[in-house]
C-alpha cells in the first residue's frame, strides 16, 4: 500500500478523502492530514458538507487524529512543510491541496520532510513538474521522471479530454475557451482586498471575469495544441459545478451531428468514465456529484461555416476533479517499485 498524507484539508482535500473512502480496491492508505484547523473541526466539516450532504460514515476525532470507519488518520498543524512528520509517518505520497506550494521548490519541501513524491491538486508553476490529465496523457506517466507531479486544474481536466477528441478527428487550428465557473475560496464573499481587483468583489452577487491558464495548460498534456488555445473565466454566484464553452476553428469541415457523434463514441469507449455525453436539456445542479471530468452537452453543439465548432461541457469542479486526483494517485501507487 502507498501511504498518503493530505496537505490542506479544504474543499479538494476533503473531497479527495471522500472519493478515496468510496473506493473498494484502492492501493492507497491515507495516514495523515496537515491543516491549519484542529481535528475536531475537520471531522465535522468532513461529516457535514453543504454540497455533498452528510457523509455516511462513522467519524470521530480527538486532539491528534480523525477516525473514519475504524481507520485512524493522524493530524498535525504546521504551515511550514519542512516541519511535517512525513519521515516519522513513513509517508510515500503527499497530496498537496493547499494551493500554496505549487512550484517545484515549494512542493519538494515535503520531500525534504521525508515524503517520496508530491501530487499537486492545482496547475504547477515553473519547471520540473510533470502535468498529467487522466484519459489524455496519464498513461505516459513515468515514475522516476518527476518528484513532483500536477493533476492540472479542474477546468483543464474538463477541457482536455473532449478537446483531444476534436483535435484528433478534425484538427484544431486555433480557438478560445470561456469557463463559466462557480466561485471558489480564492474570492471574497464580501468586498475586501485581494491581489486580483475583480476577485476582491463579493462572489455571491457578481459575475467576476478573471484569468485562467486552463486553455494554455492543455498544451502540457496535448503538445500539438501548443499556442493554439487561450481563454478566460467568468466566476458566477453558484457554489459548485462549472461549464466550459470551447470555440475552435478546425482543419476538416464538419457538421454538428458529426462532432457529437465522435464525442459520444469516445465517451462510450476510449474515454469512458472520464468523458460523458448528454443531449438532455439540463442545468448546472444536475451535474453536481458527477464522477467524470466533463459531460459534453450535445444539445448545445454548433458548427458555423463548416470549420467553426462550438462545444459546451459541464463539470463538477470539486467532486469530479477530486476523483481524478485519486485516479492519478492510484497510477503512482501502481508504479511504485
From Swiss-Prot:
It comes from Synechocystis sp. (strain ATCC 27184 / PCC 6803 / Kazusa). It holds the Pfam family Gp_dh_N. CDD domains: GAPDH_I_C, GAPDH_I_N. SUPFAM superfamilies: Glyceraldehyde-3-phosphate dehydrogenase-like, C-terminal domain, NAD(P)-binding Rossmann-fold domains. The active site is at residue 154. GO terms for cellular component: cytoplasm. This is Glyceraldehyde-3-phosphate dehydrogenase 2. It catalyses: D-glyceraldehyde 3-phosphate + phosphate + NADP(+) = (2R)-3-phospho-glyceroyl phosphate + NADPH + H(+); D-glyceraldehyde 3-phosphate + phosphate + NAD(+) = (2R)-3-phospho-glyceroyl phosphate + NADH + H(+). GO terms for biological process: glucose metabolic process; glycolytic process. Pathway: Carbohydrate degradation; glycolysis; pyruvate from D-glyceraldehyde 3-phosphate: step 1/5. The keyword Cytoplasm applies. Signal peptide: none annotated. Homotetramer. Belongs to the glyceraldehyde-3-phosphate dehydrogenase family. It is found in: Cytoplasm. Keywords: Cytoplasm, Glycolysis, NAD, NADP, Nucleotide-binding, Oxidoreductase. NAD(+) binds at residues 11-12, 35, 79, 121, 317. GO terms for molecular function: glyceraldehyde-3-phosphate dehydrogenase (NAD+) (phosphorylating) activity; glyceraldehyde-3-phosphate dehydrogenase (NADP+) (phosphorylating) activity; NAD binding; NADP binding. It comes from the Bacteria. It is an enzyme of class 1 (oxidoreductase). PROSITE patterns: GAPDH. The keyword Nuclease does not apply. D-glyceraldehyde 3-phosphate binds at residues 153-155, 184, 199, 212-213, 235.
Amino acid at each position: 500500500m502507498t501511504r498518503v498524507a493530505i496537505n490542506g484539508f479544504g474543499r479538494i482535500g476533503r473531497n479527495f478523502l471522500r472519493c478515496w473512502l468510496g473506493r473498494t480496491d484502492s492501493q492507497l492508505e491515507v495516514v495523515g492530514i496537515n491543516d491549519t484547523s484542529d481535528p475536531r473541526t475537520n471531522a465535522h466539516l468532513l461529516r457535514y458538507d453543504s454540497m455533498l450532504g452528510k457523509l455516511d460514515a462513522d467519524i470521530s476525532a480527538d486532539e491528534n487524529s480523525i477516525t473514519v470507519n475504524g481507520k485512524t488518520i493522524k493530524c498535525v498543524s504546521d504551515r511550514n512543510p519542512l516541519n511535517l512528520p512525513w519521515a516519522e509517518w513513513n509517508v510515500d505520497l503527499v497530496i498537496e491541496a493547499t494551493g500554496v506550494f505549487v512550484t517545484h521548490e515549494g512542493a519538494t519541501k515535503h520531500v525534504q520532510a521525508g515524503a517520496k513524491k508530491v501530487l499537486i491538486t492545482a496547475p504547477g508553476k515553473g519547471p520540473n513538474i510533470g502535468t498529467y490529465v487522466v484519459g489524455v496523457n496519464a498513461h505516459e506517466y513515468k515514475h522516476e521522471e518527476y518528484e513532483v507531479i500536477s493533476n492540472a486544474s479542474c477546468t483543464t481536466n474538463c477541457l482536455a479530454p473532449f478537446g483531444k477528441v476534436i483535435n484528433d478527428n478534425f484538427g484544431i487550428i486555433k480557438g478560445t475557451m470561456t469557463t463559466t465557473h462557480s466561485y471558489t475560496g480564492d474570492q471574497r464573499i464580501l468586498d475586501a482586498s485581494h491581489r486580483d481587483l475583480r476577485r476582491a468583489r463579493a462572489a455571491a452577487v457578481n459575475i467576476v471575469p478573471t484569468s485562467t491558464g486552463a486553455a494554455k495548460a492543455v498544451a502540457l498534456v496535448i503538445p500539438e495544441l501548443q499556442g493554439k488555445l487561450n481563454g478566460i473565466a467568468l466566476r458566477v454566484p453558484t457554489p459548485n459545478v462549472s461549464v466550459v464553452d470551447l470555440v475552435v476553428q478546425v482543419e476538416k469541415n464538419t457538421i454538428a451531428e458529426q462532432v457529437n457523434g465522435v464525442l459520444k463514441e469516445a465517451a462510450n469507449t476510449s474515454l469512458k468514465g472520464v468523458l460523458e455525453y448528454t443531449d438532455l436539456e439540463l442545468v448546472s445542479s444536475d451535474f453536481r456529484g458527477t464522477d467524470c471530468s466533463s459531460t459534453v452537452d450535445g444539445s448545445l453543439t454548433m458548427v458555423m461555416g463548416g470549420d467553426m465548432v462550438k462545444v459546451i461541457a459541464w463539470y463538477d469542479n470539486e467532486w469530479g476533479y477530486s476523483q481524478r486526483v485519486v485516479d492519478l494517485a492510484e497510477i503512482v501507487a501502481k508504479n511504485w517499485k
